[in-house]
From Swiss-Prot:
This is tRNA-modifying protein YgfZ. Gene3D superfamilies: 2.40.30.160, 3.30.70.1630, Aminomethyltransferase beta-barrel domains (3.30.70.1400). Belongs to the tRNA-modifying YgfZ family. It is found in: Cytoplasm. The keyword Cytoplasm applies. Folate binds at W29, W182. GO terms for molecular function: folic acid binding. One of its GO terms (cellular component) is cytoplasm.
Length: 323
């Protein structure tokens, strides 16, 4: 069997525990790489995170904005091969590549979409498995064929060449699952995400990038910095990203925006579209959405296309209070 066809749907209800060890092929994600003598200085002037202080064993969130502070991409940045990799949703990468390259002609830097394969290791035994393929410690490790990166306590990214990816997949002793479980864990961890449909809509703080340490307020200038700084010091940001959960009366659309409405008195008003979503087998779904940050947490929500549903804001796994 072709290694790329070994991944199957794992049907889970909202009450089922996650298996201890899973591997997935992250075809919906990819990486942009930067190599060259000026890679560090160039990227430092483009993104919200501090590239200069990023150590070999560290990974950081970051955002890339336009001049008005609107986000093109939210990514995980780490050292990869002889440069940097920016891991992010595949659908955002075409526009992000174009914008990131805009001023690169003046620098000794090569910016490209990586041809490496992205695999995701998930479950309570993920750390133990990584230790079997790595001789080092830390959140970023050089492994055969590429790099292993800790995404969260029970998740690792493997960014490796195709030959090594095939070896890992064929030798895998856990479950081979399709990538929606990675999306589910992103949602439950409230990982900031920008896909193609949400590019250039929000400032970083509306996506909680500051809450996951993806913004340095002490580094030098970068594109969009003025807006990002005003949002922090003048309190101009009025939005935040939330986890929402609710019931379904029909499957969610994979092609059209999934819009929520919120109750305003006796009426309903559009609240915006989900950034991403995951459906359980028991007609329950979860998602991420940007909402006004002064909303009451018991506000009533519903799917615009399914008005008989009821959705609610869920607790975030981190604090927004230090914004």
């Amino acid at each position: 069997m072709d290694w790329q066809n070994r991944f199957s749907v794992l049907n889970l209800s909202s009450h089922d525990p996650l298996p201890e060890l899973m591997l997935t092929h992250l075809t919906g994600w990819g990486a942009i790489t930067l190599v060259g003598a000026d890679k560090k200085a160039y990227l430092q002037g483009q993104v919200t995170c501090n590239v200069v202080s990023l150590q070999e064993q560290q990974v950081t969130f970051g955002a890339h904005c336009d001049a008005k502070g609107k986000v093109w991409s939210v990514f995980r940045l780490f050292h990869h091969h002889d440069g940097y990799a920016m891991f992010q949703p595949q659908s955002a990468m075409e526009v992000e590549l174009r914008e990131l390259k805009k001023y690169a002609i003046f620098s000794k830097v090569t910016i490209a979409e990586s041809s490496d394969i992205a695999l995701g290791v998930m479950g309570s035994q993920a750390d133990a498995w990584i230790d079997t393929v790595s001789e080092t410690t830390g959140d970023v490790r050089r492994i055969a064929g590429g790099t292993a990166v800790r995404m969260s306590p029970q998740r690792w990214l493997l960014l490796v060449n195709a030959e090594q990816a095939e070896q890992y997949v064929n030798a895998w002793q856990g479950l081979h699952v399709e990538q929606s479980l990675w999306t589910r864990m992103d949602i439950e961890e409230a990982v900031p995400v920008v896909t193609q449909t949400a590019q250039n809509e929000h400032i970083p703080q509306a996506l909680n990038v500051q809450a996951v340490d993806g913004i340095s307020f002490t580094k030098g200038c970068y594109t969009g910095q003025e807006t990002v700084a005003r949002a922090k010091y003048r309190g101009i940001n009025k939005r935040a990203m939330y986890i929402v959960k609710g019931n379904l009366s029909a499957p969610l659309s994979q092609d059209e925006p999934v819009v929520l409405e919120r109750a305003v008195g006796e009426n309903w008003r559009s609240a915006g579209a989900l950034l991403t979503h995951y459906r359980f087998t028991d007609s329950i779904a979860i998602g991420l959405i940007v909402l006004p940050n002064d909303l009451e947490h018991d506000v009533k929500l519903r799917l615009a296309a399914q008005p008989d549903t009821r959705w609610h804001i869920q607790p975030l796994p981190y604090s927004l209070s230090d914004e």
